């Protein structure tokens, strides 16, 4: 069974300045997606990035639970207290909820 997960930050929970911390150039988008698919049990991923949101959708093996937030922070060189503080701004969706959200955008 496929497991779909989404992690994202958007205008409803984060300021422009906070969202800018997680904006990605084309090169950084590629680096992030390559880092994600290198994780064991990850089949693929898609990154959606606009001025209002950044959302990472990942297809995983059924029981896999990689820490996608840590992978994102590593690619953006965010760590320590800042990493802990910003985690609460992110939304995580799984399975049908993640797919439904994607199609409502």
Predicted feature residues:
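N-terminal ligand-binding/catalytic initiation module
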Residues: 1-105
